[in-house]
Amino acid sequence: MQDIYFGTYTKRDSKGIYKASFDERTGQLSDLQLVAQEPNPTYLAFSKAGFLYSVGAEEGLGGIASFSPDHQLINHVVDEGAPLCYVSVDEVRGLVYGANYHKGQVLSYRIHEDGHLTFVDQATHQGSGPHENQASPHVHYADLTPDKLLITCDLGTDQVVVYQVDDFGKLTEAQTYQTAPGAGPRHIIFHSHYKTAYLINELNATIDVLFYDGLGYFEHFQTISTLPEDYEGQKWAAAIRLSEDGKFLYASNRAHNSIAVYEILADGSLVLLEIVPTNGLNPRDFILSPDQEYLIAVHQDSDNATVFKRDKETGRLTELSHDFYVPEAVCVLFN
């Protein structure tokens, strides 16, 4: 059995961070438990030491929360305004990074020996974009490049901004990549052995394939849609994941309630294989199982997780179940 964790909104039925068991022999989810009460813990990250870091809030202030390996609250680091929307761990420097969508900020925090966090530095973006959701900067992602630079996706300004980070966590802007106007870059992932990155754009529901030079510079190579050609509804792309072998890429569509499956060719470019329904509403996140045999998608608005069997040879997905209850889930990860 594998432990699988869920970050959630707590606007309706959810009370915080949940854990369930996943059986890799059968693909079944079971035994949902509330492990930590926290308002709107919408994104989660674990350190190798087992500490859990979450989007957090306390007494009307927003920020980040840290929890012990047995899910006990260690501390909050909060400020006026909205909490973060993304958190990630830098094991080498002993830092945690956060993205704040509403404030247009990227932040760094020091991890102390007992797992508690202290604020180190922040950078505030400037600018806007042509889409109605781009009136101001909206930093949606902050994580490491393969060469340990900090990379951020700003949905509000159509920019990917790269930072140098010193050993103490101080941020220095290094490079900026500009996407197509109104694209709304949300998350980015890097191929394990090609010099390519895959940028998912929320507002125009596309994936940009980018050459990456290892120094923070990107060059556009391909743009491909996450939706069927004849689809005329809302464009609202969300999560993006690579298979461990680097042969396949997956992306979720929130309004279309689907997952797009792509083959990765030898030059790093993408070919669409299929778009499969997730049998839920608003599949904001999904994850591949550690053995790569399954894909689990979670739904914010229908309170269910869908399990797909994954063909490792073809990359294609076959639904196994869609009736496991998880309230308001918007983040899923194994630990």
Give the positions of each predicted feature.
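Beta-rich, blade/repeat-based domains predominating
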Residues: 38-49, 80-91, 127-147, 179-194, ...
